[in-house]
Regions:
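N-terminal leader/propeptide and maturation segments of large enzyme subunits in energy/redox metabolism
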Residues: 168-212, 216, 230, 244, ...
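N-terminal export/assembly segments and adjacent metallocofactor-ligating motifs
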Residues: 95-383, 424, 466, 506-522, ...
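Feature captures hydrophobic
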Residues: 1-96
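Short acidic-glycine loop/turn motifs at beta-strand connectors
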Residues: 13, 21-26, 124-130, 881
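Long, contiguous, secondary-structure-rich segments that constitute the structural scaffold
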Residues: 97, 153-155, 161-162, 166, ...
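A glycine-rich phosphate-binding loop feature that marks nucleotide/adenosyl-phosphate handling sites
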Residues: 238, 391-393, 434-435, 448-451, ...
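Short beta-alpha connecting loops at secondary-structure transitions
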Residues: 355-361, 629, 636-646, 658-668
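Extended redox/cofactor-interaction regions of prokaryotic respiratory oxidoreductases
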Residues: 249-339, 343-344, 369, 467-620, ...
Length: 959
């Protein structure tokens, strides 16, 4: 965009200088110092000026000069950023060569690369439009994959990089009819008059210009800060984002939050709930929120295991975390070895249906009873690893006495659990006997250390029981460990490339993983906010409506970090008055979602802006809507399945380490802009554009990220831009591969896992000696819980069976006799690929078309359906006291009577009447789930403890 201005470049003492006049697309220049330059760039001396203005300058030197003020830039912020962008482009000229990136496929077609939550892909473009997307098939230049030798056979994955069905639907997501293409203002919102907050979610919108939208947003930010003080601004995004280290919310949004001083969201560990609030107290692993290490477990499982127990585990649906279908071939290898496979899940999930084996279907929320009964059999029949229990654990005797009934007079026998779970005692006894006599891997959750069962009312006790069972079997010895072939491949992790959770260009070393490596490799100005207020995500409605809320932090550093209450508002801070919401997912992913609809309509919140790609979910509640482009329409860079941070080395789910530039494949649709550009535009209006952007464009940040990694050692920037990806050779020699997870602990050696955690201060006698607990041992009796609250009945110091407060034994069961479970969906990454008019809607297991409308399926047993007069694909109302959702009934034997199943994360909020007060037909199952936390002293989700009733839907009449 052409601008008219005068730029002065000079030595600070005015001894030398040259100014440049830009006018109507032309530039002229003269020696000397201009008396009225619009932008002045002043250097301490000529030597520094020459050093920093040369081609391919040192970014470290440039940043350092800014930090010590030997380089200053003064002028209007928008012009300063414009000049900095221009000069960066000039001094990095070798990185820019027109449109010569991507691969020419002939006939006017270019092949680009990009990434997604469903995997990386090729993007074929012609005439500025996407033709198709495909998975990345490797070429002859790419290295061979790894081979594992096990039981006289060789196992080698194919030479391709997989992509999920929802990953490959991105073309239809880019061109979705629900795309937001222009800035919008609610028709009855007047920032200088009546704001009509009661009409949020009801009123329509009118198109406005970007200048008007940005002026309103920036002026509201300034007004609210001045009027109400620190803490009055609040920014909230979702757990996930479009792929890429630069555009990801922990990068671009995080720096924006710090630059302007927003209150932050206090996240709950939604994928790990039970392992974080319960499991970690037995063994630490706080950096992974209580979930286990899985280094080299794929090879160990193929070589040594005899049995696999998958408990609340469906990796064929959830892909671990971004792992797409990479683990499917490895589970195929396992099947070919005739290893016994057991599935424990109320729903006969997709992994069970594909892999086969024995299926156990406990009633929701009763899994812990089944686990304790298994422990009872092991104790009474001596089917456990006594060496491990005696030498690597502490407190077993107390737990053993509880199992045997010495504490409460109730032996936890298979017969006892049958009354709770509905599973015959003989079957549980047979399972326990076989498990206790075989070298067995166990996968609690699809990636191990997650799972739907940990997101129930007693999810912490379930997670604890999983760890206690594995401790009884001696985890870490050959063939006994955690995993289901989803994690733990022999890839080379000694090659540095950061995951998105390491913060991108955020410069934030408090709330990202940047301090581990990236802050040393990619120089930037520090990004720290002075605001210390947090709003608990699960209590946002209460914070808005009632003015106060309580949360507990998600702290990866210590066991005790989660014990500190985090009250809202913080001392000396204002209540939230301005809500900057990224995306629309909370209406579907957070429990008792109607609360969020009602919270938007309070006049306690004076201004709401939503920045989103699609018009869905809670976007409709904003005063101003800012349209965002997809990552197909901007530059970025990333690695397949690599999040980093609290899921360290996530790429070990993959069969190839795959790094890719995310080309700007097409121009942004309509007037949509990238998050980075929107944030920069707002910051410029508020005078902090330079601190936010450091004078870089997104392309500049991508190049800086490339330079910060090990990629320049193996591929040139030019070739990387052209080919689009690089495959790192795996570790071919078995002796060079990582030691198997926890083998060091089983054998009593120093920890040899390739990770820096836990922190040195967490070790008790010697660095890398023992676990993170007080004793350094696996603790059946948890010292941390004993110190914190030894008498807490919801979280006792030993693992116990605590019946669900919303289950068959609760009073509510008489009114709502169906137990609803809502695991993560198979065909969408949470809300990201659902709705939007995409091709995913045509998959009948995802949505069902009835009279031209795509309804969310609810699965019900034939016996329950017959009692209610429900037939296959009838429209039904799923309801309880929190609300109701209209779904399409799927009558199936894949769950037992009394249990119903519907995935969470429908993206489309479509109330039939007033928002928050009427049935929804978009499929927002979380309208029905409880907002109560698992235990009171936590900030935890219990969505899978949910009682409902179902009846036929007849429009505005139900029966």
């Amino acid at each position: 965009k052409k601008k008219n201005f005068t730029l002065q470049i000079k030595i600070r003492d005015n001894s030398q200088g040259r100014f440049f006049t830009f006018k109507n697309g032309r530039v002229s220049s003269k020696n000397g110092v201009h008396p009225g330059a619009d932008v002045t760039m002043a250097f301490e001396d000529a030597a520094l000026a020459c050093h920093l203005m040369k081609f391919n300058r040192s970014q470290l030197d440039f940043i350092s000069a800014g930090k010590d003020f030997s380089l200053t830039v003064n002028g209007p912020d928008e012009l300063c950023v414009y000049v900095a962008n221009m000069l960066t482009a000039i001094t990095n000229m070798s990185t820019i060569f027109g449109g010569n990136f991507g691969t020419d496929m002939g006939n006017g077609v270019k092949r680009y690369t990009t990434g997604s939550n469903g995997g990386p892909m090729f993007v074929y473009v012609k005439d500025g439009k996407i033709l198709r997307t495909t998975p990345i098939d490797l070429d002859s230049e790419d290295p061979e994959p790894f081979t594992i030798n096990a039981r006289g056979r060789k196992f080698t994955p194919p030479r391709r990089v997989t992509c999920t069905s929802h990953g490959l639907t991105w073309k239809s997501m880019v061109y979705s009819p629900d795309r937001l293409l222009y800035p919008m203002k609610r028709v009855d919102f007047d920032p200088k008059g009546n704001r009509n907050t009661q009409n949020r979610g009801i009123s329509g919108y009118e198109r406005i210009s970007w200048d008007e939208a940005l002026d309103i947003v920036s002026s509201e930010i300034a007004r609210v800060k001045k009027t109400h003080g620190p803490g009055s601004l609040f920014f909230a995004g979702s757990s996930h984002h479009t792929w890429g280290n630069i555009g990801y919310h922990l990068s671009a949004s995080d720096r924006f939050i710090n630059t302007l001083g927003f209150s932050r969201i206090c996240m709950n560990p939604d994928s790990w709930e039970g392992f974080y609030w319960g499991g970690m107290h037995h063994w630490g692993n706080t950096a992974k929120l209580g979930s286990p290490d899985q280094y080299s477990t794929v090879e160990d499982q193929l070589k040594n295991s005899e049995m696999l127990v998958m408990w609340s585990s469906d990796p064929e649906s959830t892909s671990g975390a971004y792992g797409t279908y990479e683990g499917a071939i490895r589970r195929e290898w396992l099947k070919s070895l005739d290893i016994k496979i057991v599935h424990i899940d109320p729903f006969y999930n997709h992994t069970a249906a594909w892999m086969g084996g024995k299926w156990f279907s406990p009633r929701p929320g009763t899994d812990t009873a089944m686990a304790l009964a298994i422990a009872y059999v092991w104790i009474t029949q001596d089917l456990y690893d006594k060496f491990f229990v005696e030498n690597r654990t502490k407190g077993f005797a107390l737990w053993r006495d509880y199992i045997l009934g010495k504490e409460d007079g109730i032996p936890k026998t298979p017969e006892w659990q049958e009354k709770e779970t509905g599973i015959p005692a003989k079957d549980v006894r047979a399972l326990a006997e076989e498990w206790g006599s075989k070298k067995t891997y166990m996968s609690p959750g699809g990636m191990a250390g997650v799972g739907s069962a940990c997101r129930g009312a007693n999810g912490g006790e379930w997670a604890r029981s999983m760890l206690c069972l594995m401790a009884m079997q001696g985890f870490g010895k050959p063939g006994v460990n955690f995993g289901a072939m989803q994690f733990g491949t022999p890839l080379n992790h000694r090659f540095f490339f950061p995951g998105y959770a390491e913060g991108g260009f955020s410069g934030d070393y408090n709330f990202t993983g940047s301090p581990v490596n990236l802050y040393q490799r990619m120089p930037s100005t520090p990004s720290v906010s002075s605001i210390t207020q947090f709003v608990p995500r699960l209590r946002i409605p209460e914070a808005f409506l009632e003015g106060h809320a309580m949360g507990y932090p998600m702290n990866p550093y210590s066991l005790e970090g989660q014990f500190f209450p985090a009250p809202y508002p913080s001392p000396g801070h204002s209540q939230v008055k301005l809500y900057y919401k990224y995306g629309g997912a909370y209406m579907s992913t957070q429990p008792e979602s109607n609360r969020y609809a009602l919270a938007y309509q309070t006049d306690n919140i004076e201004f709401v802006v939503n920045q989103s790609i699609w018009n869905e979910g809670e976007v409709r509640f904003a005063d101003i809507i800012l349209p965002v482009c997809t990552n197909f329409e901007r530059w970025d860079i990333g690695e397949f399945a690599h999040s980093g941070g609290i899921i360290d080395k996530t790429f070990l789910q993959c069969n190839h380490r795959t790094f890719f530039v995310q080309h700007k494949c097409i121009e942004p649709l309509g007037e949509s802009r990238s998050d980075f550009q929107i944030y920069t535009d707002i910051c410029c209006r508020l005078g902090v554009g330079v601190p936010y952007s450091e004078g870089n464009t997104e392309f500049d940040w991508v190049k800086r990220m490339f330079d910060a990694t090990d990629l320049p050692k193996v591929i040139s920037w030019r070739k990387f831009l052209t080919k689009g990806y690089y495959i790192l050779p795996p570790i071919y020699d078995e002796k060079d591969r990582d030691p198997v997870a926890y083998n060091w602990f089983y054998e009593g050696r120093l920890k040899d896992a390739p990770e820096l955690t836990p922190l040195p201060s967490e070790y008790k006698e010697e660095y890398r000696r023992g676990l993170q607990t007080q004793s350094g041992l696996f603790e059946f009796e948890c010292s941390s819980l004993k110190r914190f609250d030894p008498n807490d009945p919801e979280r006792p110091v030993i693992n116990k069976y605590v019946p669900s407060w919303e289950g068959r034994s609760s009073e509510l069961y008489q009114k709502y006799p169906l137990q609803l479970i809502s695991p993560h969906p198979r065909y969408s990454h949470h809300t990201m690929s659902d709705g939007k008019g995409t091709v995913i809607n045509e998959i009948s297991n995802h949505r069902i078309s009835i009279n031209g409308y795509h309804y969310w399926p609810v699965r019900i047993n034939p016996e329950d359906a017959e009692k209610r007069g429900i037939k296959h694909h009838d429209l039904v109302e799923v309801y309880n006291g929190r609300g109701s959702v209209i779904c399409a009934a799927v009558v199936t034997q894949r769950l037992n009577p009394g249990t119903v199943h519907a995935y969470e994360s429908a993206a489309k909020y479509d109330p039939t009447g007033l928002p928050g007060k009427s049935p929804d037909r978009g499929g927002l199952i979380n309208i029905l789930t409880p907002s109560r936390t698992q235990i009171r002293q936590s900030h935890s989700m219990a969505a899978n403890s949910c009682l409902v009733e179902i009846r036929l839907w007849k429009g505005d009449q139900s029966k």
